[in-house]
Amino acid sequence: MAALSIHHFRQAKQAGQPLVALTAADYATAQILDRAGIDLILVGDSLAMTSLGHSSTLPLTLEQMIHHAQAVRRGVERAFLVADLPFLSYQVCKEQALLSAGRLMKEAGVNGVKLEGGYPDMVETVAFLVQRGIPVLGHIGLTPQAKHQLGGYRQQGKTPSEAERLRQEALSLERAGAFALVLEHMPAELAAQITQQVGIPTLGIGAGPACDGQILVTHDLLGLSERIPPFAKAYANLREVIREAVEAFVGDVHQRLFPPT
C-alpha cells in the first residue's frame, strides 16, 4: 500500500476526484480510517474535547498533541497524516511555529501541520514553514481556537466584507504555499467561490457540497459525540451501541453468565 504524498491533493483537484478526511487521536481509530481509504487523517486539536473532555480546544498542549500523533502514526500506512498545531504553540512568532511543527514531524512522524487563520502574520508563518520543508494545511472561516474573539462557534463570511476577507485569505494562503485549505462553517456559495478561485484543494466542514473534499470529526461521524454540529452527519450511533454492549456485559457478570462454564 503506497503512502500518499502531497502531490496527491492537487492531482485529485485537477481530476475532479473528491477528497475525504477524518480525525483520529488513537492507534485503533487511525488504523480503521487508513484501511477504509481516507486520503488525509488529521490529528485534530478537537481531541481536547472528544478524547480529553475539555469544553474547547484551547487547553491542549503541544506535548499532548505529540503523544496522540505518535499513536496515530503507528496506525497509518497510506493516508497523508497532518497534526494541528495547538493554541499558543505557533502564534507567538514564526520561529516558535517552526519549532513546534518540527517537533511534530521529528517526534511523531506526521507529514504536515495545520494552522488556523489567514491574517497577514499567519500567512507569513505559513510561508516560513513551507520554505523550510514543512507541508501546511491552511484553515479559514470558523477557527475554533479563536472562538472567544469570534463570539462563539458562529458561521463566518455572512456579510460581503467578511466574505471578501475570506476570499483574500484563501488566495494569500495559496501564495504562501499551503497545499490545501480547510473551509469551516461558511456559506456554501462562498465556499464554492473560494474553491473555484484557488488552485489548491479545499476541504469543507459545514461549507456546502462544492468543496474539493469533505472533512469531519470522526466522533461526530460515528455518533460518539454528545452534541453533533448541525452541519455534520452521524453515519452510526456507536454511543448507543457501546452502551448496550457494556450493559449486556454487566448483566451477564451479575447473573454469572460470563465467563461461560
Curated annotation (Swiss-Prot):
GO terms for cellular component: cytoplasm. GO terms for biological process: pantothenate biosynthetic process. InterPro entries: Pantoate_hydroxy_MeTrfase, Pyrv/PenolPyrv_kinase-like_dom, Pyrv_kinase-like_dom_sf. Keywords: Cytoplasm, Magnesium, Metal-binding, Pantothenate biosynthesis, Transferase. Binds 1 Mg(2+) ion per subunit. It is an enzyme of class 2 (transferase). Gene3D superfamilies: Phosphoenolpyruvate-binding domains (3.20.20.60). Its EC number is 2.1.2.11. It comes from the Bacteria. Its cofactor is Mg(2+). It holds the Pfam family Pantoate_transf. Transmembrane segments: none annotated. It catalyses: 3-methyl-2-oxobutanoate + (6R)-5,10-methylene-5,6,7,8-tetrahydrofolate + H2O = 2-dehydropantoate + (6S)-5,6,7,8-tetrahydrofolate. It is found in: Cytoplasm. Pathway: Cofactor biosynthesis; (R)-pantothenate biosynthesis; (R)-pantoate from 3-methyl-2-oxobutanoate: step 1/2. The active site is at 184 (proton acceptor). The keyword Magnesium applies. SUPFAM superfamilies: Phosphoenolpyruvate/pyruvate domain. Mg(2+) binds at residues 45, 84, 116. One of its GO terms (molecular function) is magnesium ion binding. The keyword DNA-binding does not apply. 3-methyl-2-oxobutanoate binds at residues 45-46, 84, 114. Belongs to the PanB family. Catalyzes the reversible reaction in which hydroxymethyl group from 5,10-methylenetetrahydrofolate is transferred onto alpha-ketoisovalerate to form ketopantoate. Homodecamer; pentamer of dimers. This is 3-methyl-2-oxobutanoate hydroxymethyltransferase. It comes from Synechococcus sp. (strain JA-3-3Ab) (Cyanobacteria bacterium Yellowstone A-Prime). The lineage of its organism: Bacteria, Bacillati, Cyanobacteriota, Cyanophyceae, Synechococcales.
